[in-house]
Structure formats: structure tokens, C-alpha cells
């Protein structure tokens, strides 16, 4: 099993690479790529950690050696948010990066499962999908927007609020991966009851948690370490499912049945081909249904922006 981390010299990429070096199944190959020349050094550094995972790093303009033979590609390449920016402000730079990487993936490893971390995810996933489609290699089961950060934040904040162990809390999060499009289904958290006031306070806190970190870092970056952990959780789940483990469910932003929008985040059952089944998210509370209805215009316009960029 070969996993490639693209954007591996950045804050998210380095954190993700460290976790994968420690946590991938024995015998896995880990390839790191970044345009930054430091990348082989990041791999050399990580190679000293005594785990049965081989690691190589590649810098420069061509990601081909990292992508060759990859089963899973995790993309965190791009610029990070700074104070005063929202995820859509990243579009102008990051859209071009995702487009060129998707063009390369289409040629080098068209069968790989691709997880996109690069923001704005609502838009970058649509770009990747249409670039792969144009190349005739798109398989919607193998392309994911990684929204796991919204899930781990939800689990953490709920556990803190209710005095529970975070690992005992499961919060499905649907919609997209920015602002109002992030919808935690707090009504579905087992063993926990929320007042209306708690839901009205917790929902925007989860939606705006990224901004909380950007502001706390005071211009020094965005959520890199927690995002690295989130991408690791999703990436490892995907690897385990590809290797035949049954019953692995994660929320992810995928192309489903188009009921709400072409791409939508919801629970998915992972399998040997990527998405085995998109799972119905169940009954929503009145608050959640209203929030869903109110986000769809934003989500749809985010997706359209990506489709239009890919068509250029």
C-alpha cells in the first residue's frame, strides 16, 4: 500500500506525514512531495523514526515520482488562511494548484483514491472531479473532500460541554466544509441531550472553529496540527478499507445522488473501491433542517465556481 502526501513540507503535510509514519500498516510505503526543496529532508528526518513504514521525499516542480503506484493520494498543497481571510479567499491560488495536480494524477495514478484537504474544499473537489472527468478517468467513488476536522472538533466540543470522553462521542457532520455549510447533527449524538440554547451556541462554534485558530495564531498560520490529525484519521480509515476491513464509516464530501447538491458531505461506508455506499444521514431536527435549507445556495455556488474554473 502506497500513500502519497502532496504538500508535505507545509504545516498540515508535516503533521500528517509524522502520523502516517507512525500509524500506517507495516510494509506500507509513504511518499512525500512538495515544491519546496526541503521535502527530501523532511523524509530523511521522519525516516529515523523506527516503524516498518518506508518513506521517500521529493521536491521540485514534478510530483510524478511520489504519485507513481500510489493507492491513496492526500493533497494539502496550497496557501493557508491568515486573519481576515475566509476559505474562499484562498481560491485564486489554490484552485490552480489543485487543477494541475489533478491533471498529473489523471496520467500517473488514475486509479488512486484521492483525498483533498486544500481549501476551499467545497470548490477544490469539484475542480479535481471535472479535471479527472475531462481526462476520462473520473470515478466518483475514489474522490473525497476530507471534512474530518469538522467531526473531530464536534466530538471535542461536545465532550467538553457534557463532561464525556471524546472517544465515546460520535457526531455526524453533513453539508460542506466552510462556514454555514458545516452542519453538525447534534440531534443524533447518542447518550447526550442538548438544550436549544446549547445547540444555537455549539453549532456556530463548530462552524467557525477554524477562524478561532487563525486568530489565535495571530498571522502565524491556520489549523495545521488538528487538520493533520483529521486527515490521518480519514486516510488511515481509507487504507484499512482498501485492504479489506469491513464496516468502516467516515463522513466525507463526495459526489452522491445529487439530492441536495452535486457534492455533499455525509457518512460514507468505505470499501475496496473507495466509497462503497453513501449512507442516509437520517432524520433532522427542525433547527438542522432549516440550517440545511439555508446553506444550499452557498454550497451550490461554491461547487459551480469549481466547475467553471475546471472548464477554463
Swiss-Prot record:
The active site is at residue 177. The lineage of its organism: Bacteria, Pseudomonadati, Pseudomonadota, Gammaproteobacteria, Vibrionales. InterPro entries: L-lactate/malate_DH, Lactate/malate_DH_C, Lactate/malate_DH_N, Lactate_DH/Glyco_Ohase_4_C, Malate_DH_AS, Malate_DH_type1, Malate_DH_type1_bac, NAD(P)-bd_dom_sf. GO terms for cellular component: cytoplasm. Its EC number is 1.1.1.37. It comes from the Bacteria. NAD(+) binds at residues 7-13, 34, 94, 117-119, 227. Keywords: NAD, Oxidoreductase, Tricarboxylic acid cycle. It is an enzyme of class 1 (oxidoreductase). Pfam families: Ldh_1_C (PF02866), Ldh_1_N (PF00056). Belongs to the LDH/MDH superfamily. MDH type 1 family. Homodimer. This is Malate dehydrogenase. The gene is mdh. It catalyses: (S)-malate + NAD(+) = oxaloacetate + NADH + H(+). It comes from Photobacterium profundum (strain SS9). NCBIfam families: MDH_euk_gproteo (TIGR01772).
Amino acid at each position: 500500500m502506497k500513500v502519497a502526501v502532496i504538500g508535505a513540507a507545509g504545516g498540515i503535510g508535516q503533521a500528517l506525514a509524522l502520523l502516517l509514519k507512525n500509524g500506517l500498516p507495516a510494509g506500507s510505503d509513504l511518499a512525500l512531495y512538495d515544491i519546496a526543496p526541503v521535502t527530501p529532508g523532511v523524509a530523511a528526518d521522519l525516516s529515523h523514526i523506527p516503524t516498518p513504514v518506508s518513506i521517500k521525499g521529493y521536491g521540485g516542480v514534478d510530483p510524478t515520482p511520489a504519485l507513481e503506484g500510489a493507492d491513496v493520494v492526500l493533497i494539502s498543497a496550497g496557501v493557508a488562511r491568515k486573519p481576515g481571510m475566509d476559505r474562499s479567499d484562498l481560491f485564486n491560488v489554490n484552485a490552480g494548484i489543485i487543477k494541475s495536480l489533478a491533471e498529473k494524477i489523471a496520467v500517473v495514478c488514475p486509479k488512486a483514491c484521492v483525498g483533498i484537504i486544500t481549501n476551499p474544499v467545497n470548490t477544490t473537489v469539484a475542480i479535481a472531479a471535472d479535471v479527472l472527468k475531462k481526462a476520462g478517468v473520473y470515478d466518483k467513488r475514489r474522490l473525497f473532500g476530507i471534512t474530518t476536522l469538522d467531526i473531530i472538533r464536534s466530538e471535542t466540543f461536545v465532550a467538553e460541554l457534557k463532561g464525556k470522553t471524546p472517544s465515546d462521542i460520535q457526531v455526524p457532520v453533513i453539508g460542506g466544509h466552510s462556514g454555514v455549510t458545516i452542519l453538525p447533527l447534534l440531534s443524533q449524538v447518542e447518550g447526550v441531550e442538548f438544550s436549544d440554547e446549547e445547540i444555537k451556541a455549539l453549532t456556530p462554534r463548530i462552524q467557525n472553529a477554524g477562524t478561532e485558530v487563525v486568530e489565535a495564531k495571530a498571522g502565524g498560520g491556520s489549523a495545521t496540527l488538528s487538520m493533520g490529525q483529521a486527515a490521518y484519521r480519514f486516510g488511515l480509515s481509507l487504507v484499512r478499507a482498501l485492504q479489506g476491513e469491513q464496516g468502516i464509516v467516515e463522513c466525507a464530501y463526495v459526489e452522491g445522488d445529487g439530492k441536495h447538491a452535486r457534492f455533499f458531505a455525509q457518512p460514507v461506508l468505505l470499501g475496496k473501491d473507495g466509497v462503497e455506499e453513501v449512507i442516509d444521514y437520517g432524520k433532522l431536527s427542525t433547527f438542522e433542517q432549516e440550517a440545511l435549507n439555508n446553506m444550499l445556495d452557498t454550497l451550490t455556488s461554491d461547487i459551480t465556481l469549481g466547475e467553471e474554473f475546471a472548464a477554463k
